[in-house]
């Protein structure tokens, strides 16, 4: 399900204008990283559970649980940001940064 969500979001981003895609690029990279690492942790926990080392399996599962509960929720914020248009980013004129 996580990989499918990432794929569907990637298809949405692919359809963006170049400006909107560029505006969300950093959030897309963070979103992708968190999602794909989540998939890897699910896979590692599953592989370890099928092995013959219960201590390793418990450690992998606990680390996977930590990732899911503490880090994976960050995807929601990055996804929300990357799906926004570049309007607020482009609304600031160059001279509006002149503070001197």
Would you name each region that the model predicts?
Residues 1-100:
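C-terminal amphipathic alpha-helical interaction region
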């Amino acid at each position: 399900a996580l990989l499918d969500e990432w794929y569907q979001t990637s298809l949405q981003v692919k359809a963006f204008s170049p400006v909107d895609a560029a505006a969300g690029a950093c959030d897309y990279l963070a979103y992708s990283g968190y999602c794909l690492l989540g998939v890897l942790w699910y896979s590692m926990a599953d592989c370890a559970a099928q092995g013959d080392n219960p201590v390793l399996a418990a450690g992998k599962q606990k680390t996977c649980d930590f990732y899911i509960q503490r880090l994976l929720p960050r995807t929601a914020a990055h996804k929300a940001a990357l799906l926004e248009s570049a309007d607020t980013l482009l609304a600031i004129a160059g001279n509006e940064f002149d503070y001197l």
